[in-house]
A protein has these predicted regions:
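Glycine-rich segments within core transmembrane alpha-helices of 12-TM secondary carriers
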Residues: 1, 92-106
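Transmembrane alpha-helices of Major Facilitator/SLC transporters
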Residues: 1-15, 28-36
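A gly/Pro-rich, aromatic-decorated transmembrane alpha-helix motif that marks the paired
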Residues: 40, 100-113, 127, 138
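Loop-to-transmembrane helix entry/capping segments in MFS-fold secondary transporters
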Residues: 54, 83-94
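Intracellular juxtamembrane helix-capping segments at the cytosolic ends
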Residues: 65, 69-83
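Symmetry-related core transmembrane helices of the 12-TM Major Facilitator Superfamily/SLC fold
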Residues: 119-141
Length: 151
């Protein structure tokens, strides 16, 4: 909730200069990936068998929330704008089902996490997420063209 007024102010201040919806998605994925890489650092610096400051977790949450603010509200908005009027409710359902599917995939991936694999787990998940964000950045012009001017 802390970030909502900040982003509302930022988008208002930027006006027409703000990034497109697809770029916001790519930046959101990048932030999510960076939050995983951030969580890798304490294990690399101090080892996985010691307690570290909660600062690491708070900072990771802060980074991933920035990503969430760039994906979730934008995704909801774009879904309603792109959906045909008679199918808006169904498309919103598909948006939420895609989130559920992602959580189901994550439930399988998280099984690879142990204290022995902690650093590698966060590094691999963060790295893959960042690769997907880079791929999305490359596709932004094509996506914007397909969106036919919908911001």
């Amino acid at each position: 909730m802390i970030y909502v007024p900040i982003f509302a102010w930022l988008w208002g201040k930027m006006g027409k200069k703000q990034p497109s919806s697809s770029k916001k998605f790519a930046y959101g994925l990048l932030a999510a990936g960076l939050s995983f890489l951030w969580m890798m650092l304490p294990g690399m610096l101090f080892g996985t068998d010691v307690k570290v400051s909660p600062f690491w977790l708070i900072m990771s949450w802060s980074i991933v929330i920035v990503g969430e603010m760039l994906i979730s509200p934008i995704g909801l908005s774009v879904t309603t704008k792109l959906a045909p009027k008679s199918f808006q409710a169904q498309m919103m359902s598909i948006w939420f089902l895609s989130n559920a599917a992602a959580q189901a995939i994550n439930a399988q991936i998280v099984k690879f996490y142990t204290s022995e694999t902690e650093v590698a787990y966060y590094g691999i998940v963060g790295g893959i997420t960042i690769v997907f964000s880079i791929i999305l950045f490359f596709y932004v012009p094509r996506i914007e063209k397909l969106m036919s001017g919908i911001k």
